Each structure stands twice: as structure tokens, then as C-alpha cells.
């Protein structure tokens, strides 16, 4: 739920002159953010049916990228990352398109010198902060060269 909230807020900020007017909803605090994200094509309608337990489960790194991918549309490529060059993400994996797009746009660079992504690990707050800042501030994006 927290990832959806951040994604919805980023989307609104980028499309509303830097302003975020979203507020906690009901019956759950995250209801308004999920509705906004679905209504604006950020995430799929299936998230509306998630239980509170599902919404409060830590998000995996691959799903986090998927949730944030829909928050904006400017993913100008600054890196050349060939298909299947991320060591633990092949192009047929779930959310691979979004992950490769983030690498190519300089939003992600990998967790080691090989560019390993660790798609099924829980995302850390520090990683969330890096992704958010690179999405919002294009000058913060990083170059990466995968072997």
C-alpha cells in the first residue's frame, strides 16, 4: 500500500504543477491512493480487490518497479542495456519490461558491479528513496554499463 501511495503522489505531483492533494481515504487509509492509481492507469484494477493483509505485505523489488512504472511516461534512454544482460532478470520474467526500462533510463543501476537486481527481495527504504529521486529529478539519473 505504501508503494501505491508514493506512486500516486508522484504521478499527481508531476501532473498537477507540483501539488499533491491526495489524502488518506476509507475504509482503509490507502483506499484513495489505490483508487487514484487505478483511475489514472498507474496500476491494474486487481489491486482494488487486494485484502488489507495483501496491501500491508512488504513489496518485492520487481513489483515496486511495476507500480512506479505507471507513475510517469518519460523514460528517455541514457544507457544501453541489451536484453537479458541484467544477470537475474530475463526478458520473459514478470515485470521485465519495466525493470529494463528503469535500467535504460538510469533510474536503476543494479545492486553490484554486475547490475544484479534481486527482483524477489523486499525493497528497502534507501532503494525507494533512490528510485523516487531519480524519477523526479532527471539530473539524478545514473549511467550504467553492464558487462
Predicted regions and their residues:
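Feature responds to low-complexity, polar/acidic, surface-exposed segments characteristic
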Residues: 1-62, 70-96, 108-122, 134-147
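Catalytic cores of secreted/periplasmic or lumenal enzymes
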Residues: 99
Amino acid at each position: 500500500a505504501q508503494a501505491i501511495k508514493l506512486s500516486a503522489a508522484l504521478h499527481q505531483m508531476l501532473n498537477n504543477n507540483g501539488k499533491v492533494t491526495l489524502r488518506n481515504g476509507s475504509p482503509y487509509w490507502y483506499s484513495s491512493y489505490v483508487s487514484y492509481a487505478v483511475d489514472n492507469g498507474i496500476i491494474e484494477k486487481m489491486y482494488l480487490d487486494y485484502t488489507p493483509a495483501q496491501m500491508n505485505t512488504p513489496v518485492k523489488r520487481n513489483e515496486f518497479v511495476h507500480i512506479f512504472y505507471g507513475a510517469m511516461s518519460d523514460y528517455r534512454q541514457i544507457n544501453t542495456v541489451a536484453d537479458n544482460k541484467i544477470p537475474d532478470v530475463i526478458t520473459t520474467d514478470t515485470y521485465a519490461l519495466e525493470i529494463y526500462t528503469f535500467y535504460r533510463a538510469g533510474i536503476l543501476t543494479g545492486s553490484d558491479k554486475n547490475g544484479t537486481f534481486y527482483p524477489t527481495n523486499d525493497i528497502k527504504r534507501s532503494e525507494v528513496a533512490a528510485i523516487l529521486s531519480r524519477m523526479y529529478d532527471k539530473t539524478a539519473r545514473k549511467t550504467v554499463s553492464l558487462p
